[in-house]
From Swiss-Prot:
The keyword Nucleotide-binding does not apply. One of its GO terms (cellular component) is small ribosomal subunit. It holds the Pfam family Ribosomal_S5. Belongs to the universal ribosomal protein uS5 family. It comes from Azotobacter vinelandii (strain DJ / ATCC BAA-1303). With S4 and S12 plays an important role in translational accuracy. This is Small ribosomal subunit protein uS5.
Length: 166
């Protein structure tokens, strides 16, 4: 599993999570294509992921990066960590992420680590259960981050003050 990182001129951090070779068998033999899974973030709470397919690896990666930039979401962080513990699932992959104290670092594996790094999370404890397929882990991580809300937004929805919520 590749874990390349680039910093672009737009200020986005780009990470390559996975490149996969796929074969289609035809009458004359096999046709190989490549799929790429990438994550892009600004390190301040905006993060996106994308998948790209092509006959060449660089083209697949480029398509995935463009898809990731189009598919960005805003994550409400509490400083350098999460607001509260989050559970999420996609397919057979289940992820659990919980906030950690300052200086803990990102304790997460594989694809989940890449997503959290580009999102700007610096202190988190995370675990992946079930399938560790990078595509499903990235989807599950995004689902969990997307569902997370700040105390201010919860208070506004309920028509109460933040102190009453906490």
């Amino acid at each position: 599993m590749a874990n390349n990182e680039q910093k672009r001129d737009e200020g986005y951090i780009e990470k390559l999570v996975q490149v996969n070779r796929v074969a289609k068998t035809v009458k004359g033999g096999r046709i190989f294509t490549f799929t790429a899974l990438t994550v892009v973030g600004d390190g301040k709470g905006r993060v996106g992921f994308g998948r790209g397919k092509s006959r060449e690896v660089p083209a697949a990666i480029q398509k995935a990066m463009e898809a990731a930039r189009r598919n960005m979401i805003q994550v409400d962080l509490s400083g350098t960590t999460l607001q509260y513990p989050v559970k999420s699932a996609h397919g057979a992959s289940r992820v659990y992420m919980q906030p950690a104290s300052e200086g803990t670092g990102i304790i997460a594996g594989g694809a989940m680590r890449a997503v959290l790094e580009v999102a700007g999370v610096q202190n988190v404890l995370a675990k992946c259960y079930g399938s560790t397929n990078p595509v499903n882990v990235v989807y599950a991580t995004f689902k969990g981050l997307k569902e997370m809300q700040s105390p201010e937004s919860v208070a506004a929805k309920r028509g109460k003050s933040v102190e009453e919520i906490l």
